[in-house]
Structure formats: C-alpha cells, structure tokens
Amino acid sequence: MKIGVISDTHLNLYDDRLEQIVADHFESADIIFHAGDIVDLAVLDVFKGKQIYAVSGNMDPDSIRAVFPQKRVVEIEGWKIGLIHGWGSPPGLEDKILREFEDVACIVYGHTHRAMNEVKDGVLLFNPGSPTDRRFARHNSVGILNIGREIRGTIVPLD
C-alpha cells in the first residue's frame, strides 16, 4: 500500500503547481494523508477522488475544523498510524506528539515545514515538510509511506 503524505499546503485556492506535484508523486498512491494547515477545502480537489485522511492544523479556519479533527488514528493493513498537525515551537514537538498517541507504529505530523523520517521510542515520526512554503526549511517536500510487512517512509524533495 502506498500513501502520499502532504502537510502545510497553506493555499487559499486550487493551485497548478500543487496539481503537478500530485501528478508527479502521488499518481500511484492508494491513499492521501494531509497533516493539516490545508487552509481551504478546495485545495483537496487536486487529489481527484483518492481516499483522503486529514486533520486540521493551527492555521485552518472553522470550515476545515468542522470537517477534520485535530488528531486521529487510522489503521491500514494492521498498522495503526497517528495523524496530527502539531503546535507550538518546533523544539520538543516530537516528544509532545508522541505523548498524544498510544500503541501506534507511526505518527504523521506537520507544522514545522521541515521534513523528518526518524524512529523514536519505536515509533516512526514522519513529517513530509511543506510542498509550498519553505520559510522554515531549506527545501519544499512531500512524503511517501509504503506499508507492507513494515512501514517505510521516504521524503521527496521538490526543489
């Protein structure tokens, strides 16, 4: 199973560049995870009928918060995956989000705009970075999770 992972799009409308990113990197994805800061529901139209699991982020308006929770757990092929945006300053964020979930193999998160693909305390912490905003990162990026006998994450740099 291939999951396209994206976060922190921060777009107010449908975007041609995002459409190209999705075509290039998520065409073969079975599922999409969006880890928040969507900003406008129309942005999700770019995923063209793929199953989307998303959470709201700190920059999302009430229209997004009414549709998507702040955190959730998704079970895929027997693996429990936590999905959360994140909050506050980046130092210590991973420790905070680890405390938000029990019995998960992976936590997908955003907020920092900086990609991460590391195991901590036996949990894969996976942040795809941001495809559109690199104020806090050297590169724009998205991510791919491959799920089978294990969960493997790949960060895909976009520039």
Per-region residue spans from a language model:
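Glycine/small-residue-rich loop that forms an oxyanion/phosphate-binding "nest" at active or ligand-binding sites
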Residues: 59, 66-83, 91-100
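N-terminal active-site segment of His-dependent metallophosphoesterases
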Residues: 1-45, 49-50, 60-70, 78, ...
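A short helix->loop->beta-strand "cap" motif at the edges of active sites that frequently abuts
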Residues: 50-52, 122-123
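Pre-active-site segment of Zn-dependent metallo-hydrolases
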Residues: 13-25, 83-84, 88-101
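Active-site environment of divalent metal-dependent phosphoester hydrolases
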Residues: 10-14, 39-42, 59-65, 88-93, ...
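Active-site neighborhood of phospho(di)ester-bond hydrolases with catalytic His/Asp-centered motifs
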Residues: 5-7, 31-37, 53-58, 83-85, ...
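Binuclear metal-dependent phosphoesterase catalytic core
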Residues: 6, 76-77, 99-103, 120, ...
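Residue-level detector of beta-strand structural context in well-folded domains
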Residues: 71-72, 115, 143
